[in-house]
């Protein structure tokens, strides 16, 4: 254990592990995940840095990793070094202003979703008018596909759209922990919750820099005369 443990805590999102940015060019998906978990383990043992996940997010991540063929050994490391903890939903308080903003944003997004739907209806009607009496199923399918994509963008991107996202923020607030994610919606709301946040792509480098600094000479170990006491 480090002589001066940092005692930092981080709550990790699924997007951290799925980001291509955490992997080296010559690494496979599994190798990148394993290297990240080994770094998390070293930070836990040497720096007392703890990483957490709500069980809901952990289950989601494990399912994705299994689908991508990640070995049980690597999944075992995930279970060992990332602590699963349920957020205390009854004791963690959220400022009323945050709730008001969420309501306003959802109301705005519903209106945007309606506009997207209206646009799709008009587009479908135009396709019908252009029809020469033949089958226009492919045109309708295209309209529906575009509608789904646009509707998802209007309502879901940049917003908390699942219980898992909310669990992550509540747990981070409870633990006074930093949030590690690539999800822009979570990043935005982490700021409103008064939480530290870090892009997932930067997290491995952060831990590695901490570990390197642990073995480097420390200015605060020198005596009043500027001489390193270990060299006397």
Curated annotation (Swiss-Prot):
Q: Any idea of its EC number?
A: 3.1.26.5
Keyword Amino-acid biosynthesis part of the UniProt annotation: no
Per the record, a Pfam family? PIN_5
Catalysed transformations (reactions): Endonucleolytic cleavage of RNA, removing 5'-extranucleotides from tRNA precursor
- Which positions form S-S bridges? none
Swiss-Prot/TrEMBL keywords: Endonuclease, Hydrolase, Nuclease, tRNA processing
Q: Per its UniProt record, what InterPro entries does this chain match?
A: RNA_free_RNase_P (IPR014856)
What EC class does the entry list? hydrolase
What effect does gene inactivation have here? Deletion mutant shows no growth phenotype under standard conditions, temperature stress or salt stress.
PANTHER family under this entry?
RNA-FREE RIBONUCLEASE P, UPF0278 PROTEIN TK1425
Into which family does the record put it? Belongs to the HARP family.
This one is known as RNA-free ribonuclease P
Annotated organism of origin: Haloferax volcanii (strain ATCC 29605 / DSM 3757 / JCM 8879 / NBRC 14742 / NCIMB 2012 / VKM B-1768 / DS2) (Halobacterium volcanii)
